[in-house]
Amino acid sequence: MMHKTFLGIYTVALGILFGVVAYAQKPDVSKGESAYKPVATLQELMSSIVDPNVDPIWNSVSTISTKEGTIEKKPQTDEEWLALRKHALTLIEVSNLLVIEGRPVAASGANTSSHVTELSPKDIQKAIHANRDGFVKNAHALQDAAKLTLAAIDAKDADELVKAGGKVEHACEQCHSQFWYPNDKRPTASLDIGLKPGNSLYMKMRNS
């Protein structure tokens, strides 16, 4: 009888011991270990998630002049509005992915340069690290602008969608001009003459 009792106590003790060891091996998020494990780089998030979801929003409303006259393009059916809503939601949530710490700007050896004055990935990373709060603020501005597109989509208001799309573009430009090409004066020059983000001439000046 005593042997069985001792065996039972021994078994319980081992169970507690292994439980303590297992608990000790779990990551302690409260001590600074991140609960997130980012895999994609910022460049990959931009090309794989941001661009494919923001372009349909920007292109959803337009005016095309032809020999036959002017063609107004805007979402018409519930299905078209629903498709745009999915893009807006994805854009809202990717803003959260952008601010996860530990995410590199680009993969080793990758070329991020799309403008003459753009910094190297290493220098962009340094700039973000030096002004983390500013980077997060820009990401939140993108999310706020994307929320405006969602509100316009839910209201099925094409005019408001155009305005919100311009604010999304402005948020993107603000972040890139601050961290990717801080020495590039072209966005400022185009704005100084009264052009707004989304204007075709603005984009020509921006990409020239």
Locations of the language-model features?
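Bacterial N-terminal signal peptides
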Residues: 9-19
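Sequence context surrounding c-type heme c attachment/ligation sites in exported
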Residues: 26-85, 89-92, 96-208
